């Protein structure tokens, strides 16, 4: 049986041309999209803040969802990133494969599709350190990582 993922597919296919399996394979498993963000201000003064506050389903050690199949039922504000709504997600981290390819940029060497190592994200220190689950947080401002 032929694999549904072609070698180096991201180099010659647009995001819209990718199969569902190829689309899913783009995720490096950093988990950063599962960390809470908030926006402060309006217009030119609007600023996006990233936090160390994770969705309650995120495994903080692996950066993977603990219930990926049912994530939308269990976490009503879970973000569904699709080929059609990708342009709306300008807040994705600059290391995100979806964002990189949408901006016509190459993947980083540590990306599992390049390295061949599913643990390369952790080895490259891309995972957020000292994450905390949302259910354990009282004051979000204590957990701001940076703002853009």
Swiss-Prot record:
InterPro entries: Puta_zinc/iron-chelating_dom (IPR005358), UCP006173 (IPR008228). It comes from the Bacteria. PANTHER family: UPF0260 PROTEIN YCGN (PTHR37421:SF1). Belongs to the UPF0260 family. This is UPF0260 protein PM0539. It comes from Pasteurella multocida (strain Pm70). The lineage of its organism: Bacteria, Pseudomonadati, Pseudomonadota, Gammaproteobacteria, Pasteurellales.
């Amino acid at each position: 049986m032929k694999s549904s993922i072609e070698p180096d597919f991201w180099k010659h296919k647009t995001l819209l041309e990718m199969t569902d399996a190829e689309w899913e394979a783009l995720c490096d498993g950093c988990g950063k999209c599962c960390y809470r963000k908030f926006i402060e201000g309006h217009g030119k003064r609007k600023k996006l803040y990233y936090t160390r506050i994770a969705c309650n389903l995120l495994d903080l050690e692996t950066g993977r969802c603990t219930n990926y199949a049912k994530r939308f039922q269990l976490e009503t504000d879970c973000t569904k990133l699709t080929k059609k709504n990708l342009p709306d997600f300008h807040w994705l981290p600059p290391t995100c494969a979806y964002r990189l390819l949408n901006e016509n940029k190459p993947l980083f060497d540590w990306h599992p599709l390049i390295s061949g190592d599913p643990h390369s994200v952790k080895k490259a220190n891309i995972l957020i350190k000292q994450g905390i689950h949302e259910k354990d947080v009282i004051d979000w401002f204590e957990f701001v990582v940076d703002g853009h």
